[in-house]
Amino acid sequence: MLKNYLLVFFISMVPIVELRGAIPIGLGLGLPALPTYFLCVLGNMLPVPFIYLFARKFLIWGYHKPLIGPICRFCINKGEKGGRALEAKAGRGLTLALLLFVGIPLPGTGAWTGTLAGSILDMKFKDVVKACMGGVLLAGIIMGLASTGLLGALSTLFSVG
């Protein structure tokens, strides 16, 4: 049982998969929903301070390196372009926009991407952590409901025809 909890915890730390993949895996392994949810939130949030503090510095450092330069340039350019577009649309509501970006469980919109975007946009650390925490909590609720079949049951209940 402990092995399954550790597996889910570490899966929730993996970029792209994050808690969006860890919650269904945990429930599929027969783990209880609430402990799985909290464990996945913790695992998903654990890398956030490190990403904020070091990812941008690493990308800038690697920008002109022959081996990793193309990847670093791609990440910086993509992050700045997307971040500036988000900033232009959100204006003063950038923290809320980042929360919603992280909270909608779609590929590429998790805490890793949100934290990197916040770092590239020079958002305050506190605002990035708050937005990511809110977004991870929201994504976890959505994934938990979807994984336990509640969303499917509600859509069947309220379907027309």
What are these regions (language model features)?
Residues 1-9, 29-102, 126-127, 133, ...:
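Membrane-interfacial helix-loop-helix
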